[in-house]
């Protein structure tokens, strides 16, 4: 039981039935392994030492000088000399001084002087080299025996000490009584000793980089030197002062020890003991457990009594240790031990000490176990003397999970690549225990500050990913975990970014931790280079041009693309700064050539204004005669030697909407190496890969490593960096198949026996595949008499003839071949057998030899594959929104451009897909380690929004500024994350501000500093003001406000929904719980208290009302949490944060409404008191949506949600959402909303079948648009049916949009502004739009389902649309649904309604009146008055206004613009023509309907013309629709319908029917059939099909006249049929005398386009064009040619 006392401890569970498990041991930590039917063992690595390291070099850090001697000479007397100059121990210096008569010389001039001093070293330091084979590891193994002294002890009786060295890596340890355990260890120091030196100074040692050590500017001796006196570079510690005539002072610098200590800051310090160095190595061991056995498996259970010897002790690992003593008989025996929940129904927790046994009576035994969170009983022994101990464990499984994940991730980051052994990669996948131990291993104590941004992303990704994908097998989860974290370690080439190899797609992907994979080979589409700052780049180019650099050579294809994209922008910047220079970018062909110069970053940037930015996007600049050439062919004016090359390096990765952006910056210093940030190298099993954005070089192990194949998208000329090269020691450059100067890695993997470096391969092709196989149709033989190596040759000649026979001297088969776009080429060793080489196409390339370099870093950037990580795509809508939000944050200066990319990643990429189901698993994950789980079969249920929080925690981790220490610190950040999530999905105006605020506050989410607090608070207050604001936070705190400022604790509510029950069932990965099913709670109607479990037990947080199966309360009380009642749950189903209301288990059912002036009672359920009823008369709150009642009563916090009832006992609202007045009193609003109709009506399956035409005749107000339509559309989308929805007017279309919001629909009407992705399968438009589309030549999609709302509309376009739809349905091409309360043929003018309507017949005035008709104006409520024509309407409206009424007038022409005004409350009358029959919703209490209308009728006696006949009675269906404008609100019980006269079905003579036929005859169906009118309407018209068909131009004119000219159908038809074209308006003036149009009894004259003044008398007369002033005005404009 050694591990119990060690804080850093991991538990590894072996896979059941497995005979081995992998563990990683490290210093200061302890590993406990558990496997089925095996003893629990503790392993600890107690030391790693290096024996006798060899010395590499000694440095002197403190010296002294003795025996100083000087000699000097006068001018012309030669050089002075001293004997000491020959002695290696002396340091000497010659110099010249001025001499003359004053100091003993005859001549004036320079004379020589020499000074020597003896150099002895007082203090030195040594650099030593450690050989990995000299390391020795000591491990202690102890079984959990439970004996008295076992805890934290390792005496010989209990423990075995095992020494492990690289020479003997397999060791066996005999554990007395438990069998033997075999350990196969591969020691890893985690250090590359080839590159590291141990610097030893007195009794301290540091690990330093070898090159740094060798470059130290100090005197040194080689390690082999034994005398220790002949120091090299002595002068580095000695200073000679300026010489005087005969003397020169020499001084020694002080001790360099302090300087060395400063320089070594940050280097790893190494402990020493007795000349041996102690390391912090890791040991990766595989334990073979097959020879282990549990002690005492055959013993029987103990039946006697136990007593507790010592209090239960809690360890720091969440486990407990119990010490018991057996007082019964029958030892040795097994101890019965279990942990139960409080009801003693379920066994929870787990035993760490497997099979605890008593060996002898009265000797104490230690048992270690892991109880669940919360309360539990620990039961030891059997009845009668059973011990029952109550235990409470702090914390929560979710908190635990985050802690563990974070620790796992931290630890992965530290363990580095030592954790993975690529030789036996299979091991990782087969022993899942190991992967878990690695990633989720418990605490890693090392100080681990400053976790990089990427790391946070990764932790977030791990969590989020598991949340999204746990449906897959446990295997893939562990794989991905391993993958991500390793990815972070091995591939993070530089700090925050890295690349990963995808084996499947043979490609490398780069980014900062969130990898977006897409199975596209082409980098060009996924990645985009961008300069860090165009203006900096332009300034560097300007400077380079001044220095004589004439151009640039790109290193890679992507760089060339980047130059092409930004050329215009750079030119604009140059011209804004008046630099007379034009940049021109050319293409690249073949090899990417090398330039010899480089661009250097300049301290100043050029000016770059918004205007220029805008211009650069649109216009091109003028050309100057000085040019700067980028790529393109080499020219004499600009040779490669004078071009800059390799001057850019990757600075960061960011995510665009569709591509990964790679930001480039200028390099400080130039070299020949490729940029390593876009590279990776990896080994897996027997394959090795070197890859970057254009290369994929694959080698395989087949006895020896050989290069197998390589793909090149480009051939570049930089050198492959060593840091990304596998196995680079001992490489002969002449044997590297891919030449070093074409970026061939200097690696043993880059060779193939029998082939030498391919300096003259066909690299000029640029894009080629290299592998080992025969070119098609050729043979290769190995023979001595073959030609020598030469440039590669193509197997086809220039004329296309195939050369079939080839040979080589000593190559290996299959031969090396290249496949390019022009055919197949062989390697340089392979020559033609018979053909002369001159006749063949040979390679144009010769690659020179660089320097041979046989030594390299052994750093291996490892990569595990990480496929489909996050499969989301940002939709354009969200992208635009994000840009807006981010832009504001940028302007306010709270964010830099680099952060911007990160915010994009955080909010955009991870959230745009509805996160949906997968998240549940996250919550389950928490339950994996410890049993309590969600109280429902979550996997089968749909989620509630609160549970989404789990993912949010994962996502918020991304934005954290430091990894939070405790889970509670996460909560503010969590709330913000939650808001951002919500905002991006559905935005309202007030939310935008809150979101911006949230993003602004994120960087300091953990500790909001005061300044932040203030700015966030102000912002919050401004953005929250739309409804009610409270300053007493307890009663109603606006969630964003409260969470931002106070950091309330939303997780707390959530945690109460975790219950503690679960069945035990072992799973592969963690123990996956199977939760017992939980039913839906059933409550009786009444008021309830809502309690929350806190640290001190339950406390009341509010109240609520249960009615008709729905529970109602305030949103701020529960914030959407799931409620529990007697172990069953109720889930939220509707909420409105603005009104602060939420309902559970159904829509809002409280229907009482407070009437102004009535008294009410508040039934106050205060915490800790009995309910009491307080009667009061409410005041008024005025808000921008109207007035609401205000109750001035102040109860204690926790009363929110108490019901307010009226005299009839109906609940009129809830208490608790209000404001504090100036005097400090609290005033609550009566919070109430409309009763909701259950919104998922049953929908028959067969309405979606083709050939099926359904008529839904629901009464007005039954919810066709609000309830049935969304349900039908959702089902249609689910079935993938191409659907069309038709609305009669734009207004109804806009109402539909409200009901259908959130569904993917393309709105084809200007009334609705919405974003479209192009993937929607549902279209929505107006009846007339659809008919016009059918008439025009555009192809109308083949809709599978067409839904027509208000299908009683008798406009010609609507009738025609019905005809077309019914024809499509009859042909079996589609299904149709006609929604109307009054389908054609219905005869009931008084249909059913939601609320009772008082119908009353009385005399209704038909024109203005002076007296009488008081009932019209005395009515208190709002009235809708139907009038037969616009003229009558104007008359009546004027009369009503005279009587002081506020009137809104509606007609077909004004409907779209005026209808909006009826939404406000400031009107008394709406005066409307029959257009309002089409689904217009007025919140009115009365309809006045004279049941009269004007009808257009075609007169055929004499000259054919259209008159407006009437007023005449309306049809039954019109009457029913008019009456249906009221009676819609179930709460209004006294709506009135005032009518006059009876309706009449006599509309056959109406012009609309014939006009509809004119339209139908001109509609094309794909099958060429002319559609006929819908059957029930057919007898209204007697025309023959096709009678009105127009040909070619005439039809186009017909459509134009209706669409652009706004003419009635009949008139348009007459004009078009005559063959007149659209622009010709002469027909408006050449009619007969009778057709003269009058306005107020005056003949109308107008000015034509030609400037003549003519009388308006059209050739065909249609009364509709002059029946009212507006229509006439429009026709005059038409006739004048202005349309």
From Swiss-Prot:
Membrane side Extracellular: residue ranges: 1-445, 494-915
Catalytic activity as recorded in UniProt: Selective hydrolysis of -Xaa-Xaa-|-Yaa- bonds in which each of the Xaa can be either Arg or Lys and Yaa can be either Ser or Ala; a ribonucleoside 5'-triphosphate + H2O = a ribonucleoside 5'-diphosphate + phosphate + H(+); ATP + H2O = ADP + phosphate + H(+)
Lumenal side of membrane: 966-989, 1031-1037
InterPro entries: Flav_gly_cen_dom_subdom1 (IPR013755), Flavi_DEAD (IPR011492), Flavi_E_Ig-like (IPR027287), Flavi_E_Stem/Anchor_dom (IPR026470), Flavi_E_Stem/Anchor_dom_sf (IPR038345), Flavi_Glycoprot_E_cen/dimer (IPR011998), Flavi_NS1 (IPR001157), Flavi_NS2A (IPR000752)
Stretches assigned to the Peptidase S7 domain: 1066-1243
SMART domains from the UniProt entry: DEXDc (SM00487), HELICc (SM00490)
Residues carrying a glycan: 67, 153, 702
Residue ranges, annotated region (Important for RNA-binding): 1249-1252
Residues involved in ATP binding: 1258-1265
Protein name: Genome polyprotein
Organism: Dengue virus type 2 (strain Tonga/EKB194/1974)
């Amino acid at each position: 039981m050694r591990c119990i006392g060690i804080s850093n401890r991991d538990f590894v569970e072996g896979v059941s039935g497995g005979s081995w498990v992998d563990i990683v041991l490290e210093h200061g930590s302890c590993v406990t392994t558990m496997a089925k039917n095996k003893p629990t063992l503790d392993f600890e690595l107690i030391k790693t030492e290096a024996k006798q390291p060899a010395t590499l070099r000694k440095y002197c850090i403190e010296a002294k000088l003795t025996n100083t001697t000087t000699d000097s000479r006068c001018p012309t007397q030669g050089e002075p000399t001293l004997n000491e100059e020959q002695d290696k121990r002396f340091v000497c210096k010659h110099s010249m001084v001025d001499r003359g008569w004053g100091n003993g010389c005859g001549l004036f001039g320079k004379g020589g002087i020499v000074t020597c001093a003896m150099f002895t070293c007082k203090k030195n330091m040594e650099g030593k080299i450690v050989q990995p084979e000299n390391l020795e590891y000591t491990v202690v193994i102890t079984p959990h025996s439970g004996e008295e002294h076992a805890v934290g002890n390792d005496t010989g009786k209990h423990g075995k000490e095992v020494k492990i060295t690289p020479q003997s890596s397999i060791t066996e340890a005999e554990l007395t009584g438990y069998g033997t355990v075999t350990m196969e260890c591969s020691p890893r120091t985690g250090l590359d000793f080839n590159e590291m030196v141990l610097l030893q100074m007195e009794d301290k040692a540091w690990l330093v980089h070898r090159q740094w050590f060798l470059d130290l500017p100090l005197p040194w001796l080689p390690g082999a030197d034994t005398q220790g006196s002949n120091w090299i570079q002595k002068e580095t510690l000695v200073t000679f002062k300026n010489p005087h005539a005969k003397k020169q002072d020499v001084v020694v610098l002080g001790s360099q020890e302090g300087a060395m200590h400063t320089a070594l800051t940050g280097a790893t310090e190494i402990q020493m003991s007795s000349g041996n160095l102690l390391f912090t190595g890791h040991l990766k061991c595989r334990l073979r457990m097959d020879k282990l056995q549990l002690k005492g498996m055959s013993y029987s259970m103990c039946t006697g009594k136990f007593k507790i010897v010592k209090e239960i002790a809690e360890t720091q690992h969440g486990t407990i240790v119990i010490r018991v003593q057996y007082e019964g008989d029958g030892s040795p025996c097994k101890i019965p031990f279990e942990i139960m929940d409080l009801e003693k129904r379920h066994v929870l927790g787990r035993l760490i000490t497997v099979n605890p046994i008593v060996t002898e009576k009265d000797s104490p035994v230690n048992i270690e176990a892991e109880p669940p969170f919360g309360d539990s009983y620990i039961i030891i022994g059997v009845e009668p003397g059973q011990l029952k101990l109550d235990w409470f464990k702090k914390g929560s499984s979710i908190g635990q999970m985050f802690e563990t994940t974070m620790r796992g991730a931290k630890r992965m980051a530290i363990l580095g690549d030592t954790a993975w052994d690529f030789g036996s990669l299979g091991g990782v996948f087969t022993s899942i225990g190991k992967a878990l131990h690695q990633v989720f291993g418990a605490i890693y104590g090392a100080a681990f500050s400053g976790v990089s941004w990427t790391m946070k992303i990764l932790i977030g990704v791990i969590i989020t990913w598991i949340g999204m994908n746990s449906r897959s097998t446990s295997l893939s989860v562990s794989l991905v975990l391993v993958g991500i974290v390793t990815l972070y370690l091995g591939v993070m080439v530089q700090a925050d970014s890295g690349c990963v190899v995808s084996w499947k797609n043979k490609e490398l992907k780069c980014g900062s931790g969130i990898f977006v994979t897409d199975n596209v080979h082409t980098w060009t589409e996924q990645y985009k280079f961008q300069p860090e700052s165009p203006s900096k780049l332009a300034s560097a180019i300007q400077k380079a041009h001044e220095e004589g650099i004439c151009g640039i050579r790109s290193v890679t294809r992507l760089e060339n693309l980047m130059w092409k994209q930004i050329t215009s922008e750079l030119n604009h910047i140059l011209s804004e700064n008046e630099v007379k220079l034009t940049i021109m970018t050319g293409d690249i062909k073949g090899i990417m050539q090398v330039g010899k110069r480089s661009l250097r970053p300049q301290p100043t940037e050029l000016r770059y204004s918004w205007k220029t930015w805008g211009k650069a996007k649109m216009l091109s600049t003028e050309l100057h005669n000085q040019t700067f050439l980028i790529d393109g062919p080499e020219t004499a004016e600009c040779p490669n030697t004078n071009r800059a090359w390799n001057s850019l390096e990757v600075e960061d990765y960011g995510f665009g909407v569709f591509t990964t952006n790679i930001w480039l910056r200028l390099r400080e210093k130039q070299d020949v190496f490729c940029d390593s940030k876009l590279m990776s190298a990896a080994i897996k099993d027997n394959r090795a890969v070197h890859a970057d954005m254009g290369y994929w070089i694959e080698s395989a192990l087949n006895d020896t490593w050989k290069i197998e194949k390589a793909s090149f998208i480009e051939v570049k000329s930089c050198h492959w960096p060593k840091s990304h090269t596998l196995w680079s020691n001992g490489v002969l450059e002449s044997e590297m198949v891919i030449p070093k100067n074409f970026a061939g890695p200097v690696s043993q993997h880059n060779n193939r026996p029998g082939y030498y470096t391919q300096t003259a391969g066909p690299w000029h092709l640029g894009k080629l595949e290299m592998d080992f196989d025969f070119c098609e149709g050729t043979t290769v033989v190995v023979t001595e008499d073959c030609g020598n190596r030469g440039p590669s040759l193509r197997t086809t000649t220039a004329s296309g003839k195939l050369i079939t026979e080839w040979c080589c001297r000593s190559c290996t088969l299959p031969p090396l071949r290249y496949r390019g776009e022009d055919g197949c080429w062989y390697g340089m060793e392979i020559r033609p057998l018979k053909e002369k080489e001159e006749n063949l196409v040979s390679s144009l390339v010769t690659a020179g030899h660089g320097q041979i370099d046989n030594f390299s870093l052994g750093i291996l950037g490892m990569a595990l594959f990480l496929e489909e990580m996050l499969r989301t795509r940002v939709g354009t809508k969200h992208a635009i929104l994000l840009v807006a939000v981010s832009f504001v944050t940028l302007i306010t200066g709270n964010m830099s451009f680099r952060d911007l990319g990160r915010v994009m990643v955080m909010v955009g990429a991870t959230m745009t897909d509805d996160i949906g189901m997968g998240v549940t698993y996250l919550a389950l994950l928490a339950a994996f380690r410890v049993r309590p789980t969600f109280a429902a079969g979550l996997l089968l249920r749909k989620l509630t929004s609160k549970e989404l929080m789990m993912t949010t925690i994962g996502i918020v981790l991304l934005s954290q500024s430091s990894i939070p220490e405790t889970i509670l610190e996460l909560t503010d950040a969590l709330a913000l994350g939650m808001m951002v999530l919500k905002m991006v999905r559905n935005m309202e105006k007030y939310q935008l501000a809150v979101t911006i605020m949230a993003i602004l506050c994120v960087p300091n989410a953990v500790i909001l500093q005061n300044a932040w607090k203030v700015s966030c608070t102000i912002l919050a207050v401004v953005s929250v003001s739309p409804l009610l604001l409270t300053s007493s936070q307890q009663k109603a705190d606006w969630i964003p406000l409260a969470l931002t400022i106070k950091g309330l604790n939303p997780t707390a509510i959530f945690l109460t929904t975790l219950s503690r029950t679960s069945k035990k069932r072992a799973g592969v990965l963690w123990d996956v719980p199977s939760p017992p099913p939980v039913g839906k709670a059933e409550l009786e109607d009444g008021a309830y208290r809502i309690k929350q479990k806190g640290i001190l037990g339950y406390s009341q947080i509010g109240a609520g009302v249960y009615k008709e199966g729905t529970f109602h309360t305030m949103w701020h009380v529960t914030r959407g949490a799931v409620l529990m009642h007697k172990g069953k749950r109720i889930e939220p189903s509707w909420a409105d944060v603005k009104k602060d209301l939420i309902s559970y288990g159904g829509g809002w059912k409280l229907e009482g409404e407070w009437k102004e002036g009535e008294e009410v009672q508040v039934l106050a359920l205060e915490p800790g008191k009995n309910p009491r009823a307080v009667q009061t008369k409410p005041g008024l709150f005025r808000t921008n949506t109207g007035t609401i009642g205000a109750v001035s009563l102040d109860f204690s916090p926790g009363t929110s949600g108490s019901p307010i009832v009226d005299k009839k006992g109906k609940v009129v609202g809830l208490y608790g959402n209000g404001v504090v007045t100036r005097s400090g009193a609290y005033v609550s609003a009566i919070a109430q909303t409309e009763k909701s109709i259950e919104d998922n009506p049953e929908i028959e399956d067969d309405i979606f079948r083709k050939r099926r035409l359904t008529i839904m005749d629901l009464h007005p107000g039954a919810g066709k648009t609000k309830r049935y339509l969304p349900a039908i559309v959702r089902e249609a989308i689910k079935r993938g049916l191409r659907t069309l929805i038709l609305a009669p007017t734009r207004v109804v279309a806009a109402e539909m949009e409200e009901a259908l919001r959130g569904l993917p629909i393309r709105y084809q009407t200007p009334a609705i502004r919405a974003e479209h992705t192009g993937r929607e399968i549902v279209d929505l438009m107006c009846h007339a739009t659809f008919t016009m589309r059918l008439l025009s030549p555009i192809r109308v999609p083949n809709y599978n389902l067409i839904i027509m709302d208000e299908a009683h509309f008798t406009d010609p376009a609507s009738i025609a649309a019905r005809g077309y739809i019914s024809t499509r349905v009859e042909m079996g091409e589609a299904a149709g649904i006609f929604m109307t309360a009054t389908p054609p043929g219905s005869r009931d003018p008084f249909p059913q309604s939601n609320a009772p309507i008082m119908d009353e017949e009385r005399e209704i005035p038909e024109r203005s009146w002076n007296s009488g008709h008081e009932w019209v104006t005395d009515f208190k409520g709002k009235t809708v008055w139907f009038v037969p024509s616009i003229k009558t309407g104007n008359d009546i409206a004027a009369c009503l206004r005279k009587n002081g009424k506020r009137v809104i007038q509606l007609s077909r022409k004004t409907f779209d613009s005026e209808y909006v005004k009826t939404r406000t409350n400031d009107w008394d009358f709406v005066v409307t023509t029959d257009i309002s029959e089409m689904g217009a919703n007025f919140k009115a209490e009365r309809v006045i309907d004279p049941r009269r209308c004007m009808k257009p009728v075609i007169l055929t006696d004499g000259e054919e013309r259209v008159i407006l006949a009437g007023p005449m009675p309306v049809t039954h269906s019109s009457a029913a629709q008019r009456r249906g404008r009221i009676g819609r609100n179930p709460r209004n019980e006294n709506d009135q319908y005032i009518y006059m006269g009876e309706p009449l079905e006599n509309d056959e003579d109406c012009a609309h029917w014939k006009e509809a036929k004119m339209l139908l005859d001109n509609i094309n169906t794909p099958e060429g059939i002319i559609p006929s009118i819908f059957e029930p309407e057919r007898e209204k018209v007697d025309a023959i099909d096709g009678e009105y068909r127009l040909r070619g131009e005439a039809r186009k004119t017909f459509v134009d006249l209706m669409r652009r000219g706004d003419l009635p159908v009949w008139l348009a038809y007459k004009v078009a049929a005559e063959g007149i074209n659209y622009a010709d308006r002469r027909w408006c003036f050449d009619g007969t005398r009778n057709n003269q149009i009058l306005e107020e009894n005056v003949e109308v004259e107008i000015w034509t386009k030609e400037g003549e003044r003519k009388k308006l008398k059209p050739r065909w007369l249609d009364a509709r064009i002059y029946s009212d002033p507006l229509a006439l005005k429009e026709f005059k404009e038409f006739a004048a040619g202005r349309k």
